[in-house]
Amino acid sequence: MKKWLWFPIGILALIVIVGIVFFASLTSGKVIGAMLYVDEGVVQVDSGNGWVAGQDGMELSINDKVRTLEGKATIVIFEGEMTRLEPNTEVSIKELSLESATISQNSGSTWNRLTKLSGVAEYNVETPTTVATVRGTGFGMVISGQQNDLLVGEGTVSFGAKGTAGEPISEGWKGTIASPLVKTQLNQEEKNWINGQMSNDIESLKKLRLDIINRHGFALGVIKTTFGLTDADIEQGLKDIDDGKTDEDELAKQSPIQIDDLDRVIAITKEIKKLLGTAS
C-alpha cells in the first residue's frame, strides 16, 4: 500500500485539518484576487511605477499591467479562472470582482480558461476594438494589426466589436473582426494550438492546487516528518487521484472538518480530472 494512503482521511484533507486545528492563526484561507505565474522566460509587471520583473506567485491588483516579451505567463483570477499570455503579449486587469472580471488585452495572444471554480459570474476579454464575454469556456484571443481573432475550444463565446451586442461563436469555430465579423471553422493548426493550451491548463491547475496545499506549510512539514513522507509521495498521491485511482470525494467525506481550502482543492482536482478525461 502506498505510504500516503496510510491515513484514513487522505493527504488532502489531513493537510488542511491539521493546519486549521493546530495552526489556525497562521492560515487564513484567503482567496487571492489575481496572481501571476511566470511560466517561462522574462515577464514584466507595471503597477503604476514602471515595468519591473514579475515574480512567480506574486499578487496582482486592478489596473496592473503584465507583458511577456519573449516569456510566457498565466494570470489566475480568484483561484479558478486563467488567462495565459503567449510571448510578446500585453494585458491589464481592468475589472476584478466576483460579479465581473475583465482582462484588457492590448497586443499579442492569450488563452482564457473559465472553470467556474471561482464563482465569477461574468468574464470579459477586451481588445482595443472588440469584447468577448463568457460564463464558462476555453478560448483564445489573437491580435494581429487591426484584426482580432477569437478561437473557441470549448463552449460558446459572445464576440463582437465594442458597442455591439456581439454574436455567439461556438466550439470549433473562429470569429474574425476586421470589419465585419466573419465566422470560419478552425483549421488544424489552430486546433493543435488549442489542444496545447488545454494541456497547459492542467499544469496550471496542478500548480494552483499545490500552492493552496502549501499555505499550510508548517502542518505539511509536521505530517511529512511524522509519517516519513517525501514530496514525491505527496505528488504520487495527487497523481493517483488525478488518474482516477483514488476518489477525492470519498477522502473529503472522511474529513471531520469542512473548510474553504479543502473545498477549493477538491474543486480544482475535479477540473483537472475533467480535462484529463478521468472524471467518474
Residues of each region from the PLM?
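N-terminal Sec-pathway targeting helices
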Residues: M1-I20
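Flexible, surface-exposed loop/linker segments and immediately adjacent secondary-structure boundaries
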Residues: G19-S61, K65-E70, I77-K174, A178-T230, ...
